[in-house]
Regions:
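Conserved AdoMet/S-adenosylmethionine-binding subsite of the radical SAM
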Residues: 1-146
Length: 146
């Protein structure tokens, strides 16, 4: 069993999950006020507040990584040094080995993701991380509910 989580809550189970896939939400994921979401809703203050409520719950993340020892860290990188610094700070803070770090390209369309692949590939080679795609977006582009 694999659980995909942003780490907002510690998932207490009777036994450790086979694999935790941890994708924390950094500040580059905060919705922009007034834009339309992929679901067709306009981002308002309430949505931003809800997004930020548990965005980086370090206590829950620490508990999760201690209890579920088989995990990987899958942050989304938007190509900026600022986000790369946050990714590395988080990794070091939580003592996550580089070989458990899988960088995903930022983007919510097939075209945007493909445009990021070379940059992400070069960065992970330079920093000793792994790269993973976002295959659901490559396969279905902006289609929802797949």
């Amino acid at each position: 069993v694999t659980i995909e989580t942003e780490g907002s809550h510690f998932l207490e189970t009777d036994y450790p999950i086979d694999l935790i896939s941890l994708s924390p939400k950094f500040s580059n994921t905060i919705p922009k006020l007034g834009i339309e979401t992929p679901a067709g809703k306009i981002v308002d203050e309430r949505m931003i507040k809800q997004h930020n409520k548990f965005r980086l719950n370090h206590d829950a993340i620490s508990q999760t990584l201690k209890y579920h020892s088989d995990y990987h860290y899958k942050p989304v990188w938007d190509g900026t040094e600022k986000t790369l610094d946050k990714i590395e700070f988080f990794r070091v803070t939580h003592n996550i080995p580089k070989d458990k770090t899988y960088i995903m390209p930022a983007g919510d369309t097939r075209e945007t993701l493909i445009g990021m692949y070379k940059k992400v590939f070069e960065m992970v080679a330079e920093h000793g991380y792994n790269m993973t795609g976002r295959d659901h977006i490559i396969a279905y582009d902006t289609e929802r509910g797949v």
